[in-house]
Structures are given as C-alpha cells and as structure tokens.
Design a protein with these regions (language model features):
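Cytosolic juxtamembrane amphipathic/interface segments immediately preceding
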Residues: 119, 178, 243-244
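Soluble non-transmembrane domains of integral membrane proteins
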Residues: 1-158
C-alpha cells in the first residue's frame, strides 16, 4: 500500500492511493474518505443569506444541510460527479471524488459531525497487479479568486457556489468583482465604495435627469391645473376636456 500526498500553494491536496495485489486472487476495493467536525462552532450564524454546515454539489445540483438537520437523521445522496464538504463563514473543507465515478455521500452525526463518500463500483485488482485511486481535498479560506481558479482549472463543477452569493448571485458576484477591482486601484475599500457609488450615479444619471425634467414640467403646469379645477369645480366633464 502506498499513499502519495501533493499540496499546491493554495491548499488543494491531491491524494493518490496505490495498492499492489501480491496475492494469488483478485481483490475488490471500495475507495472511501471521511472528514469529521467534533462540535458546532460557537459563533455560528445561520442567516438565510449565509449557510454554515454541510454542503455539496451532486450532479449539478447544490445541496446545503444545517447541523440540526444532520443531527436529526443522516442524509444520503448518490451522484456521478460533484463534491461535498463542511463550510464555515470564511473557511471550507471539501472532498472532490474522481470525475465519472458514481459515489454515495453521507452526512451524519455519530460522535461528531461527519461527511463521507464511498465509490459504489469497486476497483478490482487482479493478482500481481496494482490499482490507483485519486482524491482531491480542499482545505482553505474561501477566497473568490482561488475558488474560481480551481473551478475552472480543476474542472470542479459549480465549485464557486462554495461562496454564498445569495439569491441574487447574477448581480452580487459581478458587483464584488467591480468593488475588488476598484480596491486594487485605490488601495482602500472605503474609497472603492465611494467610486462605485459615483459610477452607479453616472450610469443612472440620464434616467434621473429625465425624472427631474418631468417633475419640473409638472410643477410648471400646476398653477394652471389648480385654476381649471377652481373654475370648473361643478362640471367634471368640462374640467376633463380642459385638462386634456
């Protein structure tokens, strides 16, 4: 049995496990991995816009389970590809099984919170031969650039959903990139927010200007409208005709 662990500069582990069969018969092995959290964090804040607990993507579908849900009953899912793990507000631990291998994941509470998976189809190793299983393990802070980089370079589907962008994902994520770009230019988040506010004001200036013009026109005709109302207060039809 041989285990090889590689670690890049962004804390993605590549774990390769090699088994050599020195017996006279074939053996079946089921690759398996498990992570454990001993207790719920003291400062956990499960707002509806921020999830802390179990998380995973199974066949393109994001699943999020709270610690309370897992304490009540274990949650089992099967998938042909995806990833699974435990997330905090700023940190994340996730398993990424080999792509294309059907696996069963289990979230459960048993002397601690556990997230594990097992490959459903065994790896058959014939006599005098060897077999290899590979696993990726992410243990790091949830930095947008790092997460997006792994999602693309490592072909990890929807790995960017590790970061909870909320219901308005299509808007909040691009907005983050704009603020981040302005921060890199200015070196200060306060300045970046001010610059973003100015930019938004400039973008919507034509619309606001049109609104102000309409209000000014309404103010200009207000005296005449009041005069007509007073003049034709007893004749609604005539008032409507004059106003038109």
């Amino acid at each position: 049995f041989e285990k090889r662990i590689e670690l890049d500069d962004k804390y993605l582990f590549k774990i390769s496990q090699k088994v050599k069969n020195n017996s006279n018969s074939s053996i079946d092995l089921f690759p398996y991995a498990q992570m454990t959290r001993n207790k719920i964090p003291d400062d956990i804040q499960n707002f509806y816009i921020q999830h802390e607990g179990f998380i995973g993507v199974f066949d393109d579908e994001l699943k999020e389970d709270d610690y309370d849900d897992v304490q009540e009953k274990k949650i089992v899912r099967e998938s042909n590809e995806g990833w699974l793990g435990i997330t905090d507000k700023y940190w994340m631990t996730a398993f990424v099984p080999e792509t294309g291998k059907n696996f069963k994941s289990t979230f459960l509470y048993e002397d601690g919170f556990k997230a594990n998976y097992i490959i459903n189809k065994p790896t058959t190793i014939t006599r005098s031969s060897s077999g290899i299983n590979e696993l990726r393990l992410f243990v790091a802070a949830k930095e947008v650039e790092t997460i997006d980089g792994y999602a693309e370079n490592q072909n990890i589907k929807k790995f960017d959903l590790v970061i909870d962008w909320g219901w308005f994902y299509f808007f909040t994520k691009p907005l983050f990139f704009v603020i981040d770009y302005l921060f890199k230019i200015s070196g200060n988040f306060g300045t970046a927010i001010v610059l973003l506010t100015i930019a938004i004001r400039l973008i919507f200036f034509p619309l606001a200007n049109f609104s102000f013009r309409s209000m000014a026109k309404m103010k200009a005709v207000q005296p005449e409208m009041m005069r007509l109302k007073e003049l034709h207060k007893d004749d609604k039809v005539k008032l409507q005709q004059e106003m038109m």
